[in-house]
Amino acid sequence: RHRVICGDCTRPEDRALLLDGNKPEILLTDPPYCSGGSKESQKSTGSIGTERKNGKAPKIANDILSTRGYQNLIRGALTDIPCLYAYIFTDWRMWVYLFDLVEAAGFGVKSEIVWDKGTPGMGVGWRSQHELILFGAKAATHFDGHKGYGNVLSISRSGNELHPTQKPVELLEKLVDNTDFATGVYDPFGGSGTTLAACEAYGQPSYIMELTPAFTDVIVKRYIRITGKTTVRCVRQGRELPREEIAAIFEPD
């Protein structure tokens, strides 16, 4: 049901390898996005909010970019994808740029969804306690009015135990559930695999791309943990790993 690869979502050959001829209709992703503001104010914290100096967490690829770098990254990620509907996380700094990029990719911007985390984050002054989700569409939507979703989703943060910007599964489950008129989910910035977890809960096939090898392993390990399924197929550098190697790499002791 799910496909995961370690690759670059801006490379057509990597997208083709992941999708393998399939055409997921939903784009659901959380790209690095506070990075533009961080770079231009000469900060080094990026979208994780605070640097992790203990060496325990892999660095997020593309987390510290200029605004132009962010635009190039998102433009590349939205090029030649089959998706008809898009949910993309962002913040107030990057919203205006993302709006233009999504429209340029052929989506009509339909909604601004607010994730209310319940408590403010770190810092001083007006500390942020929300993130934004842009919803865009290339085709007609068929939302079920009986589900009663509003555009403010109040859900507590996750513990970030797997990824510095890990999103709560419950949050992504609501996005997947409310778009049940579409089939298949593509996430070009896989992170900790929360998109895959939400899709597994709702029976949606998912196609997950992650640039960092360490986080790609995190996604596979998470899938095995939440499903209990150990019959995963793993190919590395063109070689399909035997069952015992997969167990040694991904399964808990």
Give the label of every model feature segment.
Residues 1-19, 220-253:
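S-adenosyl-L-methionine
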Residues 2-216:
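Core catalytic lobe of class I
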